[in-house]
Amino acid sequence: MSEEQILNTHNASILLSAANKSHYPQDDLPEIALAGRSNVGKSSFINTILGRKSLARTSSKPGKTQLLNFFNVDDKLRLVDVPGYGYAKVSKAERARWGKMIEEYLTTRQNLRAVVSLVDFRHEPSQDDIQMYEFLKYYEIPVIIVATKADKVPRGRWNKHESMVKKSLNFDQTDAFIIFSSVERIGIDESWDTILEYL
């Protein structure tokens, strides 16, 4: 059964933005969070898997997402875009606030089913990427690794880059690893198949 038969992925809208739990939606709809470095392509990932051009605002300027953005998908699922980490031009105080906001959501939200952790397929994961993965594993939060910008890596080097990313993360082979490109539309079905396993 395809994701379209289970939910209409094109029936999506931004629901609200929240700074803390008092602003979270008050229902039991399952949520999948999206985490990753600033400019890793979270907004492009959201727009691509939902078949929309600008539902999530993309920006070449890192640090654009400053709140938890909740996207309603067919009244059956929410995608939650959390602020990108690792953006150096944000003040320490602002980084600390973002960190607290993300940690509060990830560790206390009952609706959370899994986290899509996005990494840049072109490069070795950053220390922030590694810490995020370790954080999710420590709290036993199901994690899906999505390696973005695969179109920038020649296909003949994909195996090498996948091995590099997995080795750096000390990757748990029971977790999903998806190679993704919003430009070439690679990994969309695999992303949905994996997300739907957690609903």
Swiss-Prot record:
**InterPro entries in alphabetical order:** G_ENGB_dom, GTP-bd, GTP-bd_ribosome_bio_YsxC, P-loop_NTPase, Small_GTP-bd
- Detail which positions bind GTP: 36-43, 63-67, 81-84, 148-151, 180-182
Briefly, what is this protein's role?
Necessary for normal cell division and for the maintenance of normal septation.
Gene that produces this protein: engB
Mind giving the lineage of the organism this protein is from? Answer: Bacteria, Bacillati, Bacillota, Bacilli, Lactobacillales
Disulphide bonds annotated for this chain are none
Q: Does the keyword Transferase apply?
A: no
For this record, the Gene Ontology CC terms, alphabetical, are: cytosol
Give the source species: Streptococcus equi subsp. zooepidemicus (strain H70)
Residue ranges of every copy of the EngB-type G domain listed in the record:
28-199
- Highest taxon of the lineage: Bacteria
| Needed co-factor(s) | Mg(2+)
Q: Which family does the UniProt entry place this protein in?
A: Belongs to the TRAFAC class TrmE-Era-EngA-EngB-Septin-like GTPase superfamily. EngB GTPase family.
Residues that hold Mg(2+) according to the record:
S43, T65
Concerning SUPFAM superfamilies, the annotation shows:
P-loop containing nucleoside triphosphate hydrolases (SSF52540)
Q: Which residues form a coiled coil?
A: none
Question: What name does the UniProt record give this protein?
Answer: Probable GTP-binding protein EngB
Q: Name one GO biological process term.
A: division septum assembly
User: Which keywords, in A-to-Z order, does the entry hold?
Assistant: Cell cycle, Cell division, GTP-binding, Magnesium, Metal-binding, Nucleotide-binding, Septation
Q: What is a GO molecular function of this protein?
A: GTP binding
